[in-house]
């Protein structure tokens, strides 16, 4: 561990949430390290929808124009049973109060590629892949984040590592 380097924020998890948070913090001048357990992005979508509020956040990240090429407004939703019979159908037409479509469909790998490209444009963000966090230790004015790959120090740690969050369990 480089004892002279303390990041402002360590973000555990590099999906859309971790990447967006890193961008927003980095744009404000904070030194950010993102720790991701996987060495490569997962190639299949998990999330496929966001609403107008998320579109507003992506605009704040500086990726709205890039996202416009990979999203499609979703104006009607229909949920069906196994036989294909409609159980419920409702609309989400038009723009929400933020000025963006109320609902947009996307492919998570495409959205992540857009966000990762933006992260690469911000020099105050460092991404470390292959870092499976195993421990957090509070050292008073900072936290030590440990993994088999090493350890880092940060003033704050944020868990952006999904539903089965390691950070939450520590």
PLM region descriptions:
Residues 2-17:
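Beta1/beta-strand and adjacent pyrophosphate-binding region of the FAD-binding site
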Residues 28, 121-123:
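Conserved dinucleotide-binding and phosphotransfer motif residues
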Residues 12, 152-162:
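Short hydrophobic core segments
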Residues 46, 51-118:
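Active-site-adjacent segment of FAD-dependent monooxygenases/related oxidoreductases
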Residues 129-143:
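A conserved short coil-to-beta-strand element within the FAD-binding core of flavoproteins
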Residues 26-46:
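Glycine-rich FAD pyrophosphate-binding loop
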Residues 5-7, 148-156:
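Core beta-strand elements of the Rossmann-like FAD/NAD(P) dinucleotide-binding domain
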